[in-house]
Amino acid sequence: LHGADETAPDGASLILEPTRFISEHSSRFNGQRVDYTATAGETYIRDLEGEPKATLFTFAYTKNNLAENELRPVTFIWNGGPGSASTWLHMGSYGPKRVVVPSDAQHAGLPPYPIEEAPETILDVTDLVFIDPVGTGFSRALGDYEGKDFWGLDEDAQSMANFITTWITENGRWNSPKFLLGESFGTTRAAAVARILEEDLSVSLNGIVFISQALDYQGSTPYVRDNLISFITYVPTICLLYTS
């Protein structure tokens, strides 16, 4: 699958061009017909010398046949962990297709697990880019770099921010409305990535979505004795449940 890290005749590491797979699709989401392109593949992030230091594997869904002067939003999505690929939000929540799990989600149940259209996806209102951080999914370090070079809060956020700037440059999306969407530890990552994008890379964000926020692990858990703050953090979700 990877187009990276093969061996040159002299025994050195040979980094090839990124591998990508592109297909065209059409479906109806939230009552709207959407023709879209699915791109599964690698994007290289580079060091200060311009050499690839890691490949991040992503699944991107972008709408086709845009109206004249239409500026389509793009949302960058990841799970948490740290150590989780984006499979769960991709195939279980926000992607255009989902895996059907014949259970109440406490256990996956027994196979087979069919794949069906996901009418609740948000692809009707925004393009979607599901990102696997370095060391998860098919994403990995390249050349002389190692996974541990990317496995810290700051290092992780820097690699994700570098990916976003690379992606919007390669795809001509600097002027698109841009959003981050993270889950659990992914909310911590989103806050860190947003700071780097805004302060260091001159990328302005239109919004951030926190799912199962974990910005403060100690303060947001009800399992710490007498921690009343945790219940306050649940109020927005409880309100949403009662009004939906």
Give the predicted meaning of each segment.
Residues R173-S184:
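Alpha/beta-hydrolase fold nucleophile elbow
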Residues G182-A192:
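Glycine-rich nucleophile elbow surrounding the catalytic serine of serine-hydrolase chemistry
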Residues V209-G219:
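Active-site nucleophile loop of the alpha/beta-hydrolase fold
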